[in-house]
Swiss-Prot record:
It catalyses: cytidine(34) in tRNA(Ile2) + L-lysine + ATP = lysidine(34) in tRNA(Ile2) + AMP + diphosphate + H(+). The keyword Nucleotide-binding applies. It comes from Salmonella typhi. SMART domains: TilS_C. The lineage of its organism: Bacteria, Pseudomonadati, Pseudomonadota, Gammaproteobacteria, Enterobacterales. One of its GO terms (molecular function) is ATP binding. This is tRNA(Ile)-lysidine synthase. Ligates lysine onto the cytidine present at position 34 of the AUA codon-specific tRNA(Ile) that contains the anticodon CAU, in an ATP-dependent manner. Cytidine is converted to lysidine, thus changing the amino acid specificity of the tRNA from methionine to isoleucine. It is an enzyme of class 6 (ligase). It is found in: Cytoplasm. Its main location: cytoplasm. GO terms for cellular component: cytoplasm. The N-terminal region contains the highly conserved SGGXDS motif, predicted to be a P-loop motif involved in ATP binding. Keywords: ATP-binding, Cytoplasm, Ligase, Nucleotide-binding, tRNA processing. The keyword Repressor does not apply.
């Protein structure tokens, strides 16, 4: 019986989605998973190929992968992704698009298997070292990682590229060669083609030694996670915001570790040391009467009520009006704000036949809301209700004609209150 080189101890799941580019590494992975399936008939195996459209050979690679999967009786999903310049660089953006497609393709109970190996681990470590990463970044890749509500497995992470080549030759496997892998303008290719061969010529076990260092860094991070768990519990609210008061008495090092872990929990990119310092100095310690904001790509960090918030950047809609001619159906909101819907059963009156329905994001004059005496301006109501400033011109306001009826999830006006049991509710799916 053929001895598999993949780490089968990872394969407790019986449903596996294998990332399959058609290159050497993923071909060996898929071949070994097919052999694993033969030994365990209860295993369900699928493959996914990502068509980036970057190479003129991309279509022929799809045909190659289809041929291989048909021969091995593995269902194949082909996902085409479009890459646009988002400032990350083509390598990072392609990876982001690839893993987004993986997440969308995974079925319930399925795990993702990818073909990274020991040489990849070494490259990842050195790239992190080049960026000046700390222990978290230098931990590189784990054999098992949380991903999209399931697991990402790397069963070949202990094997070298040479081992995979030997397996492929011995079993007569065919694979494709991506011409971009020979372009040393890409950092990873530079390491693989030029730097690592020199290092391995001098120190043959260099990749294995680097992998051990990555493992030690990962162990240090896990220990820190354990030691800081109580601090995190004290600092993080049920809304996922970060309380500032416990951080004030912490050392700089401890506070930075808490900030990093909070951002990781919010799925934010790992900040540099300079970025952490800016978060603390420019946002956390800003004047009490300020509304500080620090942008990170399409997200931002803000401070409100002595808490830090990690939020997606959304353009204010202060001047926007969205007509809702058929109010019985859901209405799509601008700027990715989601949808609103009027559903039966609630405390809002239905619109009269002559009243036009619209969604707006500002309301003039004094407003009289249910449960409050006297009139207030909208700004005062937002403050009383604890609505953060950045949500005040993106929270949908329901109007019948020129009359404000309700703010989604916040308040109902007296003019909008239902007088019978035929009321409706304004539901906002953000």
């Amino acid at each position: 019986m053929t001895t598999l080189t993949l780490n089968t101890s990872l394969l407790s799941s019986r449903r596996i989605l294998a990332a399959f580019s058609g290159g050497l590494d993923s071909t060996v992975l898929l071949h070994q998973l097919v052999l694993w399936r033969e030994r365990h008939p209860d295993v369900t195996l699928r493959a996914i190929h990502i068509h980036h459209g970057l190479s003129p050979h991309a279509d022929s690679w799809v045909r190659h992968c289809e041929t291989v999967c048909e021969r091995w009786q593995v269902p194949l999903v082909v996902e085409r992704v479009t890459l646009a310049d988002n400032g990350l660089g083509i390598e990072a953006h392609a990876r982001e698009a690839r893993y987004r497609a993986f997440a969308q393709t995974l079925l319930p109970g399925e795990v993702l298997a990818t073909a990274q190996h020991l040489d990849d681990q070494c490259e990842t470590f050195l790239l992190a070292l080049k960026r000046g990463s700390g222990p978290a970044g230098l931990s590189a890749m784990g054999e098992r990682s949380p991903f999209a509500g399931t697991l990402l497995l790397r069963p070949l992470l202990r094997e070298t590229r040479k081992t995979l080549e030997q397996w492929a030759v011995r079993h007569g496997l065919c694979w494709i060669e991506d011409e971009s892998n020979q372009d040393d303008a890409y950092d990873r290719n530079f390491l693989r083609l030029r730097a690592l061969p020199l290092l391995q010529q001098r120190w043959p076990h260099f990749p294995a030694a680097v992998a051990r260092s990555a493992t030690l860094c990962a162990e240090q991070e896990r220990l820190l996670d354990e030691l800081l768990a109580s601090d995190l519990t004290d600092c993080i609210t049920t809304e996922g915001t970060l309380r500032l008061s416990p951080l004030m008495s912490m050392s700089d090092v401890r506070r930075a570790a808490i900030l990093r872990r909070w951002l990781a929990m919010r799925n934010a990119p790992m900040p540099s040391r300079d970025a952490l310092e800016r978060i603390w100095q420019e946002v956390a310690l800003a004047r009490d009467d300020a509304s500080p904001c620090l942008r990170f790509g399409d997200h931002e960090i803000r401070r409100y009520q002595s808490q830090l918030w990690w939020i997606k950047t959304v353009a204010g809609q202060h001047e926007t009006t969205v007509a809702w001619p058929v109010w019985q159906t859901p209405l799509a909101l601008p700027a990715g704000l989601g949808t609103v819907q009027l559903v039966p059963g609630g405390e809002l009156r239905r619109p009269r036949e002559e009243e036009s329905v619209s969604i707006r994001f500002k309301a003039p004059g004094l407003l009289h809301i249910v449960g409050r005496h006297g009139g207030r301006k909208l700004k005062k109501i937002w403050q009383e209700q604890g609505i953060p400033p950045w949500r005040r011109d993106t929270t949908p306001l329901l109007f019948y004609g020129e009359t404000l009826i309700a703010a989604a999830g916040v308040f109902v006006t007296r003019e909008g209150a239902a007088e019978d049991k035929e009321g409706v509710s304004l539901v906002w799916h953000a």
